[in-house]
Amino acid sequence: LFIIHCSSDVSSEDILSDNNGNEGGGGFTGGGNQTIPELTVELISTYNDQTASFATPYGSFMRNFIVHTPPNFDYQTESLPLLFVLHGYTGRAPSIREYSGFDQIADEERFIVVYVQGTTDQFGNTGWNVNVVASFLGVDDVGFFKALIKYFKASYNIDSNKIFSSGMSLGGFMSYRLACELEEINSIG
């Protein structure tokens, strides 16, 4: 397991996502005492008893994600770790779900895995706001993940001390950003 911990002299104000409501900004800037928005999550489709896709509005975008829980998971009696898995530039959540193999690992090791879909830019490419691809700079991905963590704490009873992120390519960059900006992310790989 590869673990990253971020620390710098840069203040959080220097690295915050654009949250002014333009170009998809959300309602959270990552710092201060601002309220984290409640997500209105809707079931889109069910893959099987353990896996389903969901959608929620955030900022100017409809955001999608796939959730896989291990067999016989009961959120009322069990608190499990949470792993976000992020696709690369031009990738898709269903694709990284298929080739990452995390569903099987989650079943064996008992954790919840969430495959989050990045936003689509004006060129039809999908990705994340990591200050690399200009067409995603106005997207508040950090605020969205903060709201997702709040949702999973309330709806899935996740273990707050075991929230992780993993990603491929641009999704890996987003995982780095989450680890640096969100204290809830314990490590990335």
Segments and roles (model prediction):
Residues 6-82, 108, 137, 166-189:
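A domain-start/cap signature at the N-terminus of enzymes
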Residues 62-66, 73, 78-164, 174-177, ...:
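Serine-hydrolase catalytic machinery in alpha/beta-hydrolase-like enzymes
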